[in-house]
Amino acid sequence: VYVIDPGEARISRYSPRSKVQRLPVEAVSQASANQRKGRCGRVAPGICVRLFSEEDFLARPEFTDPEIRRTNLASVILQMLHLRLGRIEDFPFIEPPDGRAISDGFTLLQELGAVDRSGAMTDIGRQLARLPVDPRIGRMLLEGARQGCLAELAVIASALAVQDPRERPLEKQQAADQAHAQWNEEGSDFAAFLNLWNGFESQRQALTQSQLRSWCRRNFLNYLRLREWRETHRQIRLTCRDMGLEENKQPASGEPIHKALLAGLLSHLGNKTEEGDYLGARQRRFLLHPSSGLAK
C-alpha cells in the first residue's frame, strides 16, 4: 500500500482584509502529514512518499490552526447570543478567537439586522438562529418570504450552502462550460441555479437512477453533490415551514428574487470599471470566475 503526499491542502480561512472566506492552498501541518502517513499502514504494511524534504517537514507548524481561528464568527456569535451564553469575549474557549474576528462577526450581524448597535439580538437575529444555514444565506431566506419568492430562494440558498455540483475538470473545462451553458441565464448566475434545479428534477422523475447518473456524467454534474443539494433544500423547507414562513405558489419574477439575495450580500456589491474588472467594498478589486455565465 502506497501513500503519495504532496504536502499541501486547501484550507478554509477567513481573510480579515477582504472580509471573505477563502480556500487557499497551504502546506499542511506536521500532524496532518502524519495522519496521511498513517493511512498506508491500516490494513497492511505500506510506504508513504512525501514530495517535500525532511527540513521542510520539521519547519512546519506542529498542528493546523483550530477552525475557530480561521473562520468568520458571525454564526458562532449568533448561536451564543441565542443560547444566552454571555459575552463571547468572556467565554472560556480552549483556543480563544482573535479579537478582530469577533469584531468582524458582529459587524456582519449588524449589517444583516441580526443585532442592534449595542450587540443585542433582534427579532431577525432570533429567526436567523433557527435556520440551519450561514447567517447571510438565512437573511436571504427571510427576505425571500417577505418578497413572495421563498420557493425560489430555498433552491438558491441550498445551492449556496453546499459545494457547486457543476464540475470543470482541468482537461475538459471548455466541454464542461458548454454543457453547463444550457442552464445559464443572461444577467444572473443565481437564475442558473434555478434552471439547473428544474432540469435535474425533470430528469430525476423521468429516468432510472443509473440513467440519471449517466445524464449527470454527460453534463459534468456531480451526482452526490446534487443529492446533498436536494437534502439541504428539504431541511430548509421544513425549517421555514416550522417558522411559519409561507412559500409562494406561483413562480416569482427575477426582481423580487434578486432583492431577497441582496439582503444577504450588501457588502459584496461591486461596480464594473472601465478596465473590465470590478471595484467592491473597501476598494477591493475582483474578477468574475471563468465558469460564471456573466464572464463570457
Predicted features and spans:
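Second RecA-like catalytic domain
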Residues: V1-I4, F52-K296
